[in-house]
């Protein structure tokens, strides 16, 4: 079992990565003793893992569950209220703990519910998708979507522990696994050139779910995320680099309707647009764009935006992006494999050129 620490002073917490961790009551015990436990999951994950995690936790306290519909389109205030209603109807107090058992949607919603309920209760992340294991479960970003923008209503709120059981990936649909790989590849592009090269060399091992390859890839992503979050918890500086591909990607998700494109698929296409923007600005050359495209394609990811999206469709959503400052769109762009920076002087005419030529 691999352990990584997110260093945030009194709010520090461990990430555990390994196989069959959902049956490891010893690791969870210190976070659950004498607490009332509410597991939040969805209709897809519940038949697979809810009974297992309930049995693991039953010896530590009273365990209940709430099961939500599955999909990004349900990550909204109405379904957040379902969690609050369950907590209130069953008289959960501040000594309770919420457990997020699922992917990024469940993790984001459960974390936000924990941040809000009685002004803050403990929560635990047990991510079951690759995307949530390498990205959304770590760092304390919690939110729900609004019809006008993704993750617009939320809070920074850290979990007590992140428990990553890589065996969950064996029940993950291939499309969901590929979507998670978009975030894995992102880390190589924006932070670690050696890791990017390792990914290029280990496509087959990852696609066949080789145990050691998965643990290494997930661990490296979590190490990078933990390092970045420890430096910049609330995204005032270096943490913004983790948004590589996300400004374009969020525009795709919002325009196409949440759930029609998976988040990772939108990030993949958005990462290519970011690379093409960097090339248009002279920051990188065509060979780097090609390496990025080829690695994304190796994992069966989209490398272009939907044909139905034009420049006007993109720009109206990008102007609402959370990174906009002083009315200026700020983009994370690669400056090399393994490096990226934030740019706020990218003109809309440059963006129009890139989007029209993509």
UniProtKB/Swiss-Prot annotation:
Binds 1 divalent metal cation per subunit. Can use either Co(2+) or Zn(2+). Keywords: Amino-acid biosynthesis, Aromatic amino acid biosynthesis, Cobalt, Cytoplasm, Lyase, Metal-binding, NAD, Nucleotide-binding, Zinc. One of its GO terms (cellular component) is cytoplasm. InterPro entries: Dehydroquinate_synthase, DHQ_synth_AroB, DHQ_synth_fam, DHQS/DOIS_N, DHQS_C. Zn(2+) binds at residues 183, 246, 263. Its main location: cytoplasm. It comes from the Bacteria. It holds the Pfam family DHQ_synthase. GO terms for molecular function: 3-dehydroquinate synthase activity; metal ion binding; nucleotide binding. It is found in: Cytoplasm. One of its GO terms (biological process) is aromatic amino acid family biosynthetic process. It catalyses: 7-phospho-2-dehydro-3-deoxy-D-arabino-heptonate = 3-dehydroquinate + phosphate. The keyword NAD applies. Pathway: Metabolic intermediate biosynthesis; chorismate biosynthesis; chorismate from D-erythrose 4-phosphate and phosphoenolpyruvate: step 2/7. Its EC number is 4.2.3.4. NAD(+) binds at residues 70-75, 104-108, 128-129, 141, 150, 168-171. Its cofactor is Co(2+); Zn(2+); NAD(+). Catalyzes the conversion of 3-deoxy-D-arabino-heptulosonate 7-phosphate (DAHP) to dehydroquinate (DHQ). Belongs to the sugar phosphate cyclases superfamily. Dehydroquinate synthase family. This is 3-dehydroquinate synthase. The gene is aroB.
């Amino acid at each position: 079992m691999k352990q990584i620490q997110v260093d945030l002073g009194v709010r520090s917490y461990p990430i555990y990565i390994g196989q069959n961790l959902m049956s490891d009551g010893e690791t969870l015990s210190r976070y659950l003793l004498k607490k009332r436990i509410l597991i939040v999951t969805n209709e897809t994950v519940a038949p697979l893992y809810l009974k297992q995690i309930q049995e693991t936790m039953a010896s530590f306290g009273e365990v209940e569950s709430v099961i939500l519909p599955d999909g990004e389109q349900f990550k909204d205030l109405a379904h957040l209220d379902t969690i609050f209603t369950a907590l209130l109807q069953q008289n959960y107090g501040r000594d309770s703990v919420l457990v997020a058992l699922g992917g990024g949607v469940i993790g984001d919603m459960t974390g936000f519910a924990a941040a809000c309920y009685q002004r803050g209760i403990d929560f635990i992340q047990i991510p079951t998708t690759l995307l949530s294991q390498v990205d959304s479960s770590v760092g304390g970003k919690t939110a729900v979507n609004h019809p006008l923008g993704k993750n617009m209503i939320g809070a920074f709120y850290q979990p007590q522990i992140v428990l990553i059981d890589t065996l969950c990936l064996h029940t993950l649909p291939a499309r969901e696994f590929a979507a998670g790989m978009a975030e894995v590849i992102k880390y190589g592009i924006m932070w670690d050139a050696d890791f990017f090269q390792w990914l290029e060399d280990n496509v087959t091992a990852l696609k066949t779910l080789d145990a050691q390859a998965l643990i290494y890839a997930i661990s490296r992503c979590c190490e990078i995320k933990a390092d970045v979050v420890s430096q910049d918890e609330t995204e005032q500086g270096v943490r913004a680099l983790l948004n590589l591909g996300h400004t374009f990607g969020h525009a795709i998700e919002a325009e196409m309707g949440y759930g029609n494109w998976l988040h990772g698929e939108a990030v993949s296409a958005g990462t290519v647009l970011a690379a093409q923007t960097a090339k248009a600005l002279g920051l990188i050359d065509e060979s780097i764009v090609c390496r990025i495209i080829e690695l994304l394609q190796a994992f069966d990811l989209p490398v272009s935006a939907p044909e139905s999206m034009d420049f006007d469709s993109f720009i109206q959503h990008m102007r609402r992006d959370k990174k906009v400052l002083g009315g200026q769109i700020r983009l994370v762009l690669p400056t090399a494999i393994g490096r990226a920076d934030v740019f706020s002087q990218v003109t809309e005419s440059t963006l129009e050129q890139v989007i029209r030529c993509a």
